[in-house]
Amino acid sequence: GIFSKFGRKKIKNLLISGLKNVGKEVGMDVVRTGIDIAGCKIKGEC
């Protein structure tokens, strides 16, 4: 009924927001790693 529809929507929203947060974290790690690699290549310290 109404509750199961609402429950599904809420679970879906939680999953989506969770995935977005994970994506941000992973994205930041990738960016940081990329900057580190670029920095050591510029300095010639890789």
From Swiss-Prot:
Expressed by the skin glands. GO terms for cellular component: extracellular region. Its main location: secreted. One of its GO terms (biological process) is defense response to Gram-positive bacterium. Keywords: Amphibian defense peptide, Antibiotic, Antimicrobial, Disulfide bond, Secreted. Pfam families: Antimicrobial_2 (PF08023). Disulfide bonds join 40-46. InterPro entries: Antimicrobial_frog_2. It is found in: Secreted. Coiled coil: none annotated. Antimicrobial peptide. Stimulates insulin release by BRIN-BD11 cells in vitro. Belongs to the frog skin active peptide (FSAP) family. Esculentin subfamily. This is Esculentin-1. The lineage of its organism: Eukaryota, Metazoa, Chordata, Craniata, Vertebrata.
